[in-house]
Amino acid sequence: MTPMSTAQQRVDANAKVTGMQRYGTERAPDGLAFAAFAVATIGKGRVISVDTDAAWKVPGVQQVMTHIDPDELRSPGFIMGGGYGFQSRQPLVDDHIAYRGQPIALIVADTLLAATEAAELITATYEPEPLAVTLDAPDAETVVQSDAIPIPMFADTVAGDADAAFAAAPVQVDVEFHGPTQHHVPMELISSVVEWHGDTLVVHEGTQNSGAIQNGVALQLGIDPSRVEVISESVGGGFGQKNSLQPHIGPLAIAARRLGRAVKLVLTRPQTFHQASFRPASRQRVRLGADASGRLLAAIHEVDQQTSRHDLFPALYTEVSSRLYGIGDFRGRERLVRTDTQTPGFMRAPFEHISVYALESAVDEIAYATGQDPVAIRLANDTTQDPVTGLPFSSRHVAECLRRGAERFGWADRNPEPRSMRAPDGTLIGYGVAIGAYPGDAAPAIAKLSADAGGTISVAVAGHEMGQGIRTAITRLVANDLGIEPAAVEVSVGDTRRAPQHLTAGSWGTTTALPAVHAALRELRSRLGLPETGAVDLHAAVTTTGSPRVDVEATTVAPGQPADVVDQLRKGLVAIAGPEYPGFVTFSYIAHFAEVRVEPTTGRIRVPRVVSVADCGRVASPVTAASQVRGGVVWGVGATLREQSRVDTRYGGFLNSTMEEYPIPVNADIHQIDVDFVDEPDPLLNPVGVKGLGEVAMVGVSAAIGNAVFHATGTRFRRLPIHIEDVLAHL
């Protein structure tokens, strides 16, 4: 196959910068009506009554729905329990309030202004109940995950005898870390346009999972999935919050059917904080044992993670912490804490970000306790074999990431003594390093290619364009394979009319779509009687067949998956495999080096530069891959120094649910981000040699920054985000 390392801009770059790129709800069908929600103002209890009189008096109001018969709108089921929704609970079907901000009425009107005004006029009386919204609340209920969800994927992680090895270790670290609730805050709000074309429901939405919407809303409404079409041309940021069926789509479909008009709903920013998933709060205890040289002998990793009352959102923190180093004695356990919130969910590097923050901070403490260089201790504890299964890694170039990153960063210039490096103005300077890993998962896919006599080729495959550049990666693969111009390639993703759609998340989008397209290209060459490789004259090849167009289709599954797993794909269910495969284990890796500057009088932390070197297999699209890493670093800066969703312990919900009050990094916070890649293909995972990148890009950033803050100040901060007042208290 032709190398894919030459640079090329995004295929959708021009459309994005000129405003021509169409997102989910950027359409206005004839007769479009607008919807808005009225929401609960208590955190738990029952609705006694809802007063809609004032809402009905607003000119233009067409519908006010406060209750839908459960037979008309069923639960979609929880995505992590074999269902389709981000949570199993479906609002508007009973009088129970499970969390603050839960919808209690859906208003549909001729204009957005009328719908919004009517929603604000709806009042309700409640019967409130005591609530728990934090890990330590008296009414929160804690369950052991391996007992509550007795399937291997969510079992305790055990290798060797970690307790005995830790007790015998001459150097020990025993520390606790706290991760906050956080929200995704994508630029594009959660929104939908739904309309009925006869008996067919058409949904336009920016989503990461068109297949779940298609099959999930069909289940809810009791219709065949073939009568539901979902189109998601582009997504204005997802990051995990848009990876499932949202609870508003079913009610919206019913409203559109009753009204006989298309209906559009755009959640407000505060509603995205209360009606969609979020990163749950967590508490981690990490115990590391080492010998005097810094060789890691034992690790014990115990986690408490927030979940909702109605669903158990499973935790996978120890999947990565058990495999980041060659620690033969490891014990990991996750516990879930039921609270009165909507169900939390996946947010970029959902478990790995905070898990590695804890582990890599503890490793840094071991380095200082043993007098070892933080880079050297990581290199010394590297491994080529998975310590959990004993299987080899399909590829692991984390040592190369560390060596290359250290050279690019200038790590040799670091004075190891904390508080020893200062700028001429007295600003404290700190250097920090951390590595990260993310499981190399993959899913089944069906790719359809159509080559025409005009020399163009269209591709339809499972995937969603959320800005990560999947269209560009697919275009590059096809153009390079056939030796044609990228402009001759048209790519369709996110459209259930064109191909079955699987969830795009967990960095398996590229590792799923590209192998399927690669297989379809092999089928196309065979059909056209062409050699396995080399440039193709599509016009001549197609014309020779006597048809104006040649269509081919290829189905691929992840290594070790049975062929019938494709049935799960067609049903819109999650069907991933990994990181354990027959004969090998796969992860992506990264090394981050961070410089921080801490102002000694104010405690303000700045991050003037970060160097990140990634091992993601073959780099499918250098331009978009580098953007993915830069974006992950920006996310890491925000998670470390800015982002926290403040909970209201009295009434439930989140207090800072707007972009004004939920601080994310702005341009002035972000400086130099130097990105590099190992760019070594991983042929065991798939024939294209690609591994995931979008998630691992964030993993380890917080630890690198936190370790740099320690180097600058001499103080460890084990609670994220690190606030100015925390730093000031120790300067």
Task: Say what each PLM segment does.
Residues 6, 12-18, 80-83, 87, ...:
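Glycine-rich loop/linker segments at domain edges
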Residues 77-79, 168-182, 265-272, 426-435, ...:
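Short Pro/Gly-enriched beta-strand edge/turn motifs at strand-loop
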Residues 110, 261-307, 518-542:
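Phosphate/diphosphate-binding loops
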Residues 67-68, 222-227, 257-263, 292, ...:
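C-terminal catalytic domains of large/alpha subunits in multi-subunit enzymes
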Residues 11-15, 120-131, 208, 215, ...:
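Extended active-site and interfacial segments that coordinate phosphate-rich ligands
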